[in-house]
Amino acid sequence: MSRYQDAGVDVNAGYELVHRIKDAVKSTDRPGVIGGIGSFGGMFDLEKLQVQHPILVSGTDGVGTKLLIAQQMNKHDTIGIDVVAMCVNDVLAQGAEPITFLDYIATGHNDPAKMAAIVSGVATGCREAGAALIGGETAEMPDMYAANEYDLAGTVTGIAEKEELLTTAGPQKGDILLGLPSSGLHSNGFSLVRQILFKDNHVKLTDRPEALRGKTVGETILTPTRIYVQAVLPLVHRKLVHGISHITGGGLIENVPRMLGDNLQAVIDPGRWPQLPVFDYLRVLGGLTKEDCFEAFNMGIGMVLAVAPDQVAQVQEILSNKNMTSYQIGYLRHCLPDTKKIVIK
């Protein structure tokens, strides 16, 4: 054993991991990728995209304490989808197409099988989003993390035609708000979720409460975050959306206003879309108010589009053709600059 291994860092495990993930990484390639893994930096040829006035849009994010659920369940092959989704949905909200992705894993012990499962999930998310996984880092830090612990983060670079960028100047009074359904909790609110389930009520991940309709608590809350890129990007290219909000931390209350100018207010009716069982389950179990729920969770809506009234039918048809359900959940109206930006009926 080398002195480095004696200190807790296994270089050979790192080599094995690279071998294990080669095929998964390669599966995400797209035109423009230069080289492969192992270089000092990932490279991409923007000329291959034939964008007239390219604007790069970057985003970085993690998965929060949802990681603890994956670690407790010893299920690591979907959490990578979450980190990709959190990043690519963010740049999509600016009108950008994700083109490249980098992942970062920090762990106390490099278990090649576990790390490869994580990267496999990252690759799955990248394929779904159309982004190439052009590099990453796995840092073995035995004095920073316990052997079975890891943290996961990602960085995406997207590209947009300058004239297709979405800003707060886009949404207009009278626009209809279309809600795209979430797959569940996505990757936000898990500190509250864990408080309700495990600290206040001693729920087990293997429990199958009637409210969850046959699913275990674990599989319900670990459901991967939905990726909206393939369904929504065609709308951006055709200039059929005025604004996009990715519903992440802070729920609808915090995120819908982020796409609005100072003189607009969103009016949203929760009765316009079906509620997922997990939210009612958490509300009842945690004794949460309506306000608590809408401030912490996406409440079944993962992305909101602002669309001109005369284009709603066309947009919904395009979404349907991409197997994406949509709901007319509200509208935009004029308000004074110091008025609250969203009303939940």
Swiss-Prot record:
Pfam families: AIRS (PF00586), AIRS_C (PF02769). Its EC number is 6.3.3.1. InterPro entries: PurM-like_C_dom, PurM-like_C_sf, PurM-like_N, PurM-like_N_sf, PurM_cligase. Its main location: cytoplasm. GO terms for biological process: 'de novo' IMP biosynthetic process; adenine biosynthetic process. GO terms for cellular component: cytosol. It catalyses: 2-formamido-N(1)-(5-O-phospho-beta-D-ribosyl)acetamidine + ATP = 5-amino-1-(5-phospho-beta-D-ribosyl)imidazole + ADP + phosphate + H(+). Belongs to the AIR synthase family. This is Phosphoribosylformylglycinamidine cyclo-ligase. It comes from Limosilactobacillus reuteri (strain DSM 20016). The lineage of its organism: Bacteria, Bacillati, Bacillota, Bacilli, Lactobacillales.
